[in-house]
Amino acid sequence: MANIPLILASSSRYRRELLDRLGLAYTCVSPEVDETPLAGESPVQLCARLARLKAEAVAKTNPHAVVIGSDQVCDLDGQALGKPHTFEKAVAQLMSMQGKRVVFHTAVCVLSPVLPPQETISDTVITMRALTEETVRDYVEREKPFDCAGSAKIER
């Protein structure tokens, strides 16, 4: 399998950083996937579906490559919290998590031309302590988590 190209089906700088740590040669292709949750879909189902869709979207045009698709969904009381994209939405998401159990589902799907698909989901569970709004705003200003599920940078 040494001659099979490896493609990360993502535009996420965080996923690139994780793959860089392994020292593997790979390329990135940003998949075009509709990330809208389906009716009745749980956060963990959404996460698994998106990881697979991302891998499949890239594998269609790269059938001879190993393709890694991944997604992360923040699950607060059974509701998926997406990327906030704005300062105020990030503050609101983080304020809503205080004192609650929050699950970050991370799904990975690996598609290969020579092996069956491999899929897994890993959960990171946190309980957000009580924070002042000023502290939350300072965090959002400093970290700018606008592209992170649930406004939390938990990769570090």
Please give the residue ranges for each predicted region:
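N-terminal G-site helix/loop of the GST-like fold
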Residues: P5-V29
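Anionic-ligand binding patches
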Residues: A2-I7, D20, P43-R156
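Short glycine-rich, Thr/Ser-proximal phosphate-binding strand/loop in the N-terminal lobe
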Residues: G23-G40, P117-D123
